[in-house]
């Protein structure tokens, strides 16, 4: 928590990405860039000549070229389908801040323990995650030219945490993210997976007509 909260970018480049993506192996040898200054800026560039860092950068560029080719095929397909009268419901996707942490950093067991053992750190990380998720989601949506952003909701269902915990840890950051997107002219479209009936009263606190709610399984009478 401490490293991520202090400098998420450094944590991503030197810790997280080398662990989850093989092409980033070697990036942990990068210097702590914000500490470079004056002649240290020049000297610090030596790190990019290290064999493992050079190999990582070459792999990253090669992978990026493949992703670019895939993206171009996807854009061409989407445009062709739209021209034939089948526009996509959405192009961009994003994730709730709590789900980002639970799915990709701490895991189910770790995050559930954090609800009791690391409350302050979890809340601070949620605040930080909300900021960069807002920026990245707006950028993705505008680049796609489609105003709807899809959110698969993983950790909001009734069985995963108490209502008090939901209102403390899960909902505030997601609501803030959705409001930020709405203010930017974007339409959030979360899919509330599993049963979220107990959450209905809370999640109604959003500007009417500004988002689309999907429900996998809930009391639709109460939902309406």
Predicted regions and their residues:
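Catalytic cores of TIM-barrel enzymes
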Residues: 1-224
């Amino acid at each position: 928590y401490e490293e991520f909260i202090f400098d998420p970018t450094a944590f991503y480049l030197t810790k997280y990405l080398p662990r989850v993506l093989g092409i980033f192996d070697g990036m942990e040898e990068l210097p702590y860039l914000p500490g470079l200054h004056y002649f240290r800026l020049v000297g610090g560039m030596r790190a990019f000549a290290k064999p493992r860092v050079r190999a990582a950068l070459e792999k990253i560029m090669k992978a990026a070229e493949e992703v670019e080719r895939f993206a171009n095929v996807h854009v061409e397909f989407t445009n062709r389908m739209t021209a034939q009268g089948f526009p996509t419901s959405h192009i961009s996707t994003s994730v709730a801040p709590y789900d980002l942490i639970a799915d990709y950093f701490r895991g189910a067991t770790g995050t559930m323990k954090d609800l009791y053992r690391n409350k302050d750190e979890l809340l601070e990380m949620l605040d930080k995650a909300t900021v960069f998720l807002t920026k990245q989601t707006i950028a993705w949506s505008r680049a796609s030219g489609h105003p709807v952003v899809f959110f698969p909701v993983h950790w909001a269902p009734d069985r995963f945490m108490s209502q008090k915990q939901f209102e403390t840890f899960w909902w505030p950051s997601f609501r803030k993210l959705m409001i930020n997107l709405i203010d930017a002219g974007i339409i959030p479209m979360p899919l509330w997976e599993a049963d979220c009936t107990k959450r209905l009263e809370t999640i109604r606190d959003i500007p009417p007509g500004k988002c689309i709610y999907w429900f996998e399984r809930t009391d639709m009478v109460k939902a309406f």
